[in-house]
């Protein structure tokens, strides 16, 4: 039974989609004014992994993730670069698609843009005005937060506490327009020279929160199964989405809210963000780090937990991935001399691993326990591959299971070239050196023995480890 932690109820709940066998899932996408950084990628990877697991369990997943292609940040960035807002959006949407493809994130079923849905946004805002939930003022349109009885339910904050915080962030201009400090913009009047659209309230553009309400309900329906994003979106963005959507449709907006933990960096574990200027873009890091390693590093931490980004943690991920790849290569190598022996014992054991993996992942997508099962499977694979007589059917069954489970983490397992290259040997020697330093002699011997099977002999000398090919 799959359970998911629902931010709205603050507890794990059995996952039951509205329509059996189909999951409608919306993930808040980026504001496309710059390259995505590692923190943005964490959200994309976390929920791509959720999607992959749902598909693994047999669900058809309608996965919608938007692009915010007009807002204050985009207007500012376009002016700084001397290009139009649409040109800026096109530049960074293309970059997003390239970067996410590099880290093996499946394209969404739909990637709608805010600017493609202006007509629907205006209609949605008009509906809220007619119902008394919104009011126009000098070209802007604001939402009456207090009119929505459940405002604050997602973030668990009282209206009084929210009012104190909101009062501190209301500009002088907004003081004269808003009926209440809690009210937020649905539509913003255009300033001179800004990109804008005609509306019943004059030229303007949509507010950020209304974009996601409109696009999620337009493409997935009035009630969606999963709405996901980073923890920083819980309030005000997702809180406001609930208020807007449920006021307009009169129906429950989202059945399960999922929020991923932050990526932290530095000795003080600061949240990685553009505002703190401590971010690293995916565009830059994949020039130095194997994209599969970055993906594996991100995908193997449970989505609600924070991730500490560091070179040491990346190195650990590299070593663990090498360990899995080496086991896969050993199996491939043994296919050459495998016989047609019995496979039943192996397939029975694989069923146990498969069930163990599902049990782990069914617990709120617990990838850390899931990958622990993969490591157990790898250990079993290595022991089997070292036997004198192996079955071809068994070898292929183990490989198939490894490929299937690793694909859920977004990692492609493929056989390396039969002739192991020098770079790979050096990586394994370095991994062996670390294992010996940590007194992990079992892993050290495993690397040495696996290389020997591939015709590589290691020699430990006072000057370091050398190797030769038989």
UniProtKB/Swiss-Prot annotation:
InterPro entries: Cys-tRNA-ligase, Cys-tRNA-synt_Ia_DALR, Cys-tRNA/MSH_ligase, CysS_C, Rossmann-like_a/b/a_fold, tRNA-synt_1_cat_dom, tRNAsynth_Ia_anticodon-bd. One of its GO terms (molecular function) is cysteine-tRNA ligase activity. Zn(2+) binds at residues 28, 212, 237, 241. ATP binds at residue 274. Its EC number is 6.1.1.16. It comes from the Bacteria. Pfam families: CysS_C, DALR_2, tRNA-synt_1e. Signal peptide: none annotated. One of its GO terms (biological process) is cysteinyl-tRNA aminoacylation. A motif ('KMSKS' region) lies at residues 271-275. One of its GO terms (cellular component) is cytosol. SMART domains: DALR_2 (SM00840). It catalyses: tRNA(Cys) + L-cysteine + ATP = L-cysteinyl-tRNA(Cys) + AMP + diphosphate. Binds 1 zinc ion per subunit. Keywords: Aminoacyl-tRNA synthetase, ATP-binding, Cytoplasm, Ligase, Metal-binding, Nucleotide-binding, Protein biosynthesis, Zinc. HAMAP family: Cys_tRNA_synth (MF_00041). Monomer. Belongs to the class-I aminoacyl-tRNA synthetase family. This is Cysteine--tRNA ligase. It comes from Limosilactobacillus reuteri (strain DSM 20016). The lineage of its organism: Bacteria, Bacillati, Bacillota, Bacilli, Lactobacillales.
